Amino acid sequence: MKHPTFRGLLRLAAFLLGLALIVAFANTFCIKTDIYAALTMAEVKARSDIEVAFVGSSIVRDHFNADMISKEIGKTCFALGIPCGMLQGNIASTRELYRKNSPEWTILVIEPFTVDSAREGIEGQYDLLPFLSSPFEQLRYYYSVAKEDGWYVDRAFMFRDYAVDSFGEFMETVGMHLRPFQTYEKIRPTLDPRMTYMGSGYSRCDTDERATKMVRQQIIREYTGYVYDLLPQTREMLLEYRDLVAQKGSKLLVFIYPNMTAHNLAIPGFLDYADALTRFCGENDMPCVNFSYAKPELYPRETDQYYFDLYHMVGEGADIFSASFCKFFKAYLAGEDTSDWFYADRWAYFSSVSFITNCWIQTYFPEGEWNGAWAQSRQAVAAASENGARDVYAANCNHGPSVAPEYRFFLRDEATGAETPLTDWQAEGILACDKGALTGQCIRVYARAQGGADDPSLYFDFRPGIDEEPCLQV
């Protein structure tokens, strides 16, 4: 006769096993699927001929034209990019890559956002976890991401936040697991027409859309006073990645991806993280190249114009980047000295930026903390405010140190687009007015190099008031 307690334990074990199977099913088939991540994972699991693997986030997926690079360097390449993937995802996807492939080179592609936190967003987890082959690897990846933020329940029950909305979406997800490429061809007419999966992990975006408005409205220089460096957890994961690659017998290259110029000029820590990563790699036998410091003769700065959002380029830009990478990598493989293609440090890089990327306006608050990112002196702004008796708006811009900017303010009619001058061109970038005189109205500022030609596209619209949101562009 079985002991009652033992029967209870068996029932509990059966319940937990059943729950685990239900959760695993829901997290696999009942969540929305990133079509391009699914295709990437399906192809990498089917391949065994990969000689060079690029591992990273959507930056890899959208910018490394693997087939083009393969033809140019004479080695079979694959772009293993998972959107929103951080180092935990890079480690898990590389383990998946190594199940059937033994690449000669594993190139870990990192951007500052990869190392500004040790946490991987659930968005990256839901793109990757369902497509890992082994339940053990799924659990190992799940634990690696959950231990950093403590979201064990949220991460275990992904389907609560990313559930399919219809039976059709459910069947689409099932199809992407069982017959991914046939399903892709079937549903392709319903997908974003701008995006095409080209194979070997590369997804190409073809659109006339550009990030001009996003750059204008969002990339505003900040000052935090914070010292940016790699987190201890980040250092541990980088060493874990190095050891994983070494155990496979592959050669590692850490590649710091070059984002658009405005990011380098404006975002706190953007270049600091890259410099910290370069130092860490040098101290730990990890070859590293910082493409953020690539000179125009290697990587043309005109690629800024090919971004369709703040981080991703259209296919033309990806082709230019891929060609630049090929030029570098072929020389690197040949043992050539490539140092002349790169600026020695950030100051040399900054000095090479001889233009203005974007400008903006912000309100001065006498009682608030001084904005250390402003080029104006605190005394000049305070004097213009007459001890808070007048409203003051300060204009600034992202530019290289060789550029001396000047600004001109206008009052803009949002309905017609008509502009009335408020100032002449001035280097101070300060607009002062009677208290409340411009509240709720639209101020437009233009920026240019002092004495230079006007650039009608280099402007910023600003509505003083409670919300202080950018004006509607007409």
What is the predicted role of each segment?
Residues 421-428:
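Short beta-strand segments within Ig-like beta-sandwich modules, predominantly Fibronectin type-III
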Residues 242-269:
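Active-site segments of SGNH/GDSL-like serine hydrolases
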Residues 432-441:
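Surface-exposed, short loops/turns at beta-strand junctions within beta-sandwich domains
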Residues 125-248, 340-361, 370-374:
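Secreted/periplasmic serine-hydrolase-like ester/acetyl group-modifying domain
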Residues 55, 59-146:
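Membrane-embedded segments
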Residues 7-28:
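Hydrophobic membrane-insertion alpha-helices, especially the h-region
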Residues 348-386, 418, 461-474:
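Short, compositionally biased P/S/T/A/G/V-rich stretches that sit at domain boundaries
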